[in-house]
Amino acid sequence: VSTLNDDELAKIRNQEIGFVFQSFHLLARSSALDNVMLPLKYAGCSEDEAIRRSEKVLEKVGLSDRKKHAPSELSGGQQQRVAIARALVNKPSILFADEPTGNLDSKTGNDVMNLFKELNNQGQTIIIITHEDNIASQSNRIITIMDGLIKSDNRN
């Protein structure tokens, strides 16, 4: 990737990699559907195709009945599922989740982890970055990094 120009790197980021953050980064004045459609708009997808794909992925994360709701009308767990749907809508090869349960209570965090397990069982590659041992222990593989060095690499 070091030889790619900015446009090529942006294309990879937008089409091959999905990102989920601890803070949901949803647009406050947009509906769940519009938030999920955003990456497709940047990718030049038609409005009809963007709606179809966004509705499908919202259904996949269990939020088809909340698609017209603004983030302020959703619980923290629902907002995180909208963020996950947005990360998945471009069908990325890999999903990076940076502290995806950090702002959630333990039950909602477990719900998000169950969703990740389901997605992984369907073939989605997911890398979760977490400081929470109880979250890490739910993964198939745990790589511990300290001071920039790999300290352990274990499969569950």
Predicted regions mapped to residue ranges:
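H-loop (His-switch) and adjacent beta-strand-loop-beta switch element
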Residues: I142-N154
